[in-house]
């Protein structure tokens, strides 16, 4: 799921998404549980 936060790196998303992890998209949004 998309999380509307401004990420700078995948690490930001992993912290925000929790154990399932996530990645930072080109639009600087986190995509969790991909």
From Swiss-Prot:
It is found in: Secreted. GO terms for cellular component: extracellular region. It comes from the Eukaryota. Keywords: Antibiotic, Antimicrobial, Disulfide bond, Secreted. The keyword S-adenosyl-L-methionine does not apply. The keyword Disulfide bond applies. One of its GO terms (biological process) is defense response to bacterium. Active against both Gram-positive and Gram-negative bacteria. This is Buthinin. It comes from Androctonus australis (Sahara scorpion).
């Amino acid at each position: 799921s998309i999380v509307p936060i401004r990420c700078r790196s995948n690490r930001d998303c992993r912290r925000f998404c929790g154990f399932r992890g996530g990645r930072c998209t080109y639009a600087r949004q986190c995509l969790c549980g991909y």
